[in-house]
């Protein structure tokens, strides 16, 4: 019974919806019928005669003024549309049409079923889009005190944004703190230091934490009833305090390396103690996880110090040992540091071995992986590559593989080639990057430009082939070729990560909507007609009459511009030009 009632209600609802769909036609005919019935009381014929008389008495100046007013309004609309597009990246009228007019016309109802049906199929791509818009820690980030601050002293510009430094503060609190820090005075001070915005306050807090560790605890041990002896015991050092001083206070890489070595001694001792106690409870497990992060960070930065100071082989050994000791800590992306160091040594076979392990479909990609793979394939053919010869004989198999690798890399991050080809100036890379964005391109090119220059002909091959990628993906925001569609969020995130004096690279280039171009053309054409009509009213009237006659004629397709001007000359009765005196007898 209930099912029958439900079915009846559904049928009644569908009938009402159907009736409202076609009810407007009934109302239209009713209005026409009322107008016809009331034509005499409303004096419709008299009103129409008055309107026609008014239109006949209008002078051409009125139409010129009307045209000029419409041109002015069109110009104001154009200026507003251009401002709205520059600020928000979309057309105001198109947005209003899609957001407000389309639901009124039933567009949302038609698409809602399709969206609900395809929601499960698009869930993977949505998750991928969110992951691609995630901000990552730059594995090759510079030292604040020894590199970023020196740049500020020389140029007076701040290379890091507040948003970037705030993300670093959050990373430090995640990696270097735990819930049991309040039990140790030095760690409690450092927990507050990582939250400080003022660099001097952070440095002062780090020194305070080290001074607390220098306090010696004295324990009385009675040896004889009449005498005592004082046993001196040192508290463990605070490794995170040394990390902060090495990152922000040290003005050279050598000073930073000394502080990191002191941090390594303290961090290694804390790591060994917490490793023995990690199974005694969740508190000890969290402390061991924190000590592991501290130790890995210190060793990685020591390897980067060795790389900066020219001890590249030592840096490679330290990175390999670190990856063997902690294979599961992929959050630091140490393999990207290793790839850069191996390229500096020109150990291309080792680079290929690392790529074979990390250039996997199940692992997240990066510009370092994609462009390093392209560099290795370009290295095999770049020294003999010639675009003229390739156009004559075609590409060989090796050249085709190199071109495909370049296209793959450019599709992943299309901003990198402009920096490698020095079409855009480089700046210091930020501490955080957005994969496939301009920030990642800067971070990659800053360290790898020298490696591309070292391979003969590699930049030439890149210059000849990188733009061909865009022909394969004409709509990169909707569909990709080898990767997911290019994320829309990169421009906004890069503007937050990169300093204001840098011009952020935007992909794909935003083109003006058709409505803005159409409005601009219509406004210009109308204004030109108004000006010509005001200056030459008789000529424009004759020209308009000739155009109307031509458009109304059945032989319009046989007319051309010459025929139009001949018709205008006939209307104006322009006499023929006098014959030149040189041809008179």
From Swiss-Prot:
Pfam families, per database record: ST7
Coiled-coil region list: none
Glycosylation sites: 47
Signal peptide: none
Topology of the protein relative to the lipid bilayer: Multi-pass membrane protein
Keyword annotations of the record: Glycoprotein, Membrane, Phosphoprotein, Transmembrane, Transmembrane helix
Keyword GTP-binding (UniProt): no
Transmembrane segments: 15-35, 62-82, 512-532
Chief place where the protein resides: membrane
Phosphoserine carried by residues: 386
GO-annotated cellular components: membrane
InterPro entries in the cross-refs: ST7
Protein's UniProt keywords contain Phosphoprotein: yes
Location(s), subcellular: Membrane
PANTHER family: SUPPRESSION OF TUMORIGENICITY 7, SUPPRESSOR OF TUMORIGENICITY 7 PROTEIN
Family to which the UniProt record says this protein belongs: Belongs to the ST7 family.
The protein, known as: Suppressor of tumorigenicity 7 protein
Gene symbol of the encoding locus: ST7
């Amino acid at each position: 019974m209930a099912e029958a009632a439900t079915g009846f209600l559904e049928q009644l609802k569908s009938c009402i919806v159907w009736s409202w769909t076609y009810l407007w036609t009934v109302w239209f005919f009713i209005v026409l019928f009322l107008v016809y019935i009331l034509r005499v009381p409303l004096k419709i014929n008299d009103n129409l005669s008055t309107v026609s008389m008014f239109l006949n008495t209008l002078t051409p100046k009125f139409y010129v003024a009307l045209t000029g007013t419409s041109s002015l309004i069109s110009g104001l609309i154009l200026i507003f549309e251009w401002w709205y597009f520059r600020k928000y990246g979309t057309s105001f009228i198109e947005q209003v049409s899609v957001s407000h007019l389309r639901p009124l016309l039933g567009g949302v109802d038609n698409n809602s079923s399709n969206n609900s049906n395809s929601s499960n199929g698009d869930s993977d791509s949505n998750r991928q889009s969110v992951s691609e818009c995630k901000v990552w820690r730059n594995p090759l980030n510079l030292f604040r005190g020894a590199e970023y601050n020196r740049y500020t002293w020389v140029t007076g510009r701040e290379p890091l944004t507040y948003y970037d430094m705030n993300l670093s503060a959050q990373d430090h609190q995640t990696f270097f703190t735990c819930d049991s820090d309040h039990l140790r005075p030095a760690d409690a001070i450092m927990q507050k230091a990582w939250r400080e915005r003022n660099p001097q306050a952070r440095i002062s807090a780090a020194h305070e934490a080290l001074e607390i560790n220098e306090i010696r605890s004295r324990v009385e041990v009675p040896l004889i009833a009449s005498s005592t002896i004082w046993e001196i015991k040192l508290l463990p050092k605070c490794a995170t305090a040394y990390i902060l001083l090495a990152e922000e206070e040290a003005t050279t890489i050598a000073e930073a390396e000394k502080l990191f070595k002191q941090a390594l001694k303290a961090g290694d001792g804390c790591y060994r103690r917490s490793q023995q106690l990690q199974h005694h409870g969740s508190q000890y497990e969290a402390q061991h996880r924190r000590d592991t992060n501290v130790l890995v960070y210190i060793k990685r930065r020591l390897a980067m110090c060795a790389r900066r100071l020219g001890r590249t082989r030592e840096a490679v050994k330290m990175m390999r040992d670190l990856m063997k000791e902690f294979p599961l800590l992929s959050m630091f992306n140490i393999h990207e540091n290793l790839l850069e160091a191996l390229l500096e040594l020109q150990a291309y076979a080792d680079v290929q071995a690392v790529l074979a392990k990390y250039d996997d479909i199940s692992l997240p990609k990066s510009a370092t992986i994609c462009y390093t793979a392209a560099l290795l394939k370009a290295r095999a053919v770049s020294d003999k590559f010639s675009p003229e010869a390739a156009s004559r004989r075609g590409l060989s198999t090796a050249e085709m593989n190199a071109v495909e690798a370049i296209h793959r890399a450019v599709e992943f991050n299309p901003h990198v080639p402009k920096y490698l080809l020095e079409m855009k100036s480089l700046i210091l890379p930020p501490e955080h990057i957005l994969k496939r964005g301009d920030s990642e391109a800067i971070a990659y090119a800053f360290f790898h430009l020298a490696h591309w220059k070292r391979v003969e002909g590699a930049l030439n091959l890149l210059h000849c082939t990188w733009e061909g990628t865009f022909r394969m993906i004409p709509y990169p925001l909707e569909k990709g070729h080898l990767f997911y569609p290019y994320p829309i969020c990169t421009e906004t995130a890069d503007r937050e990560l990169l300093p204001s004096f840098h011009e952020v690279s935007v992909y794909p280039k935003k083109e003006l909507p058709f409505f803005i171009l159409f409005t601009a053309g219509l406004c210009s054409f109308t204004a030109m007609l108004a000006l010509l009509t005001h200056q030459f009213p008789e000529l424009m009237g004759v020209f308009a009459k000739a155009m109307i006659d031509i458009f109304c004629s059945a032989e319009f397709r046989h007319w051309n511009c010459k025929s139009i001007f001949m018709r205008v000359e006939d209307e104006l009765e322009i006499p023929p030009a006098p014959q030149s005196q040189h041809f008179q007898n």
